[in-house]
Regions:
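Flexible glycine-/small-residue-enriched beta->alpha junction loops
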Residues: 99
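Glycine-rich FAD pyrophosphate-binding loop
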Residues: 1-13
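Helical element adjacent to the flavin cofactor pocket in flavoenzyme catalytic cores
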Residues: 107-143
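Conserved active-site and cofactor/substrate-binding residues in soluble primary-metabolism enzymes
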Residues: 14, 30, 34, 86, ...
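Short beta-to-alpha linker loops that shape the active-site pocket of alpha/beta-hydrolase fold enzymes
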Residues: 5-7, 91, 124
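Dinucleotide-binding Rossmann-like beta1-alpha1 core, especially the glycine-rich loop
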Residues: 17-94, 103
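Alpha-helix N-cap/helix-start motif
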Residues: 9-12, 69, 117
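Short loop/edge segments at beta-strand edges and connector loops
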Residues: 3, 87-88, 137-139
Length: 143
């Protein structure tokens, strides 16, 4: 494997590591659900640590976006997405520090969270090396 700079020097190194479930397309949702299962058992399936913390994820939308959010969630639940739409008045039971003023709905994904992008990168790199992959860093591909 060739890396122009060093592993994690691109977008991965600047990622906040949010791991969530609901996306607008079934294909993306299926991919992230598989990924979530890997992050939950990263040590067993890949090796190393992912730093995954199941903190839950909240996504607030205005009133005009609520119907689209409800439609997307209804379609994605059949794929295994674990989420619910909260009325802004009920947000306090999940996160009392957020002011719900101006929100039309809040998507709550209790099984989602965040991971450590650097640890995940290192885990996959180590797993690749154990399987015979040579990782060359500081190499630019020109053709």
């Amino acid at each position: 494997m060739l890396e122009r700079r060093f592993l994690g020097s691109g977008g991965t190194g600047r990622s906040v590591g949010i791991i969530r479930q609901l996306y607008p397309t079934p294909e993306t949702t299926q991919m992230v659900l598989r990924s979530l299962a890997i992050f939950e058992r990263f040590g067993e399936s890949v090796g190393g640590e992912s730093g995954f913390v199941r903190s839950g994820v909240l996504i607030g939308v205005g009133a005009a976006m609520r119907p689209a959010l409800e439609k997307t969630l209804a379609l994605q639940r059949g794929l295994g997405v674990s989420a619910e739409i909260l009325d802004p008045r009920d947000l306090g039971r999940v996160e009392p520090r957020i002011d719900p003023a101006g929100l039309g709905a809040v998507l709550y994904e209790p099984g989602s969270g965040y991971g450590d992008p650097s640890a995940v990168t290192a885990g996959y790199a180590d797993a690749a090396r154990l399987r015979g992959v040579a990782i060359e860093q500081g190499v630019e591909v020109t053709a």
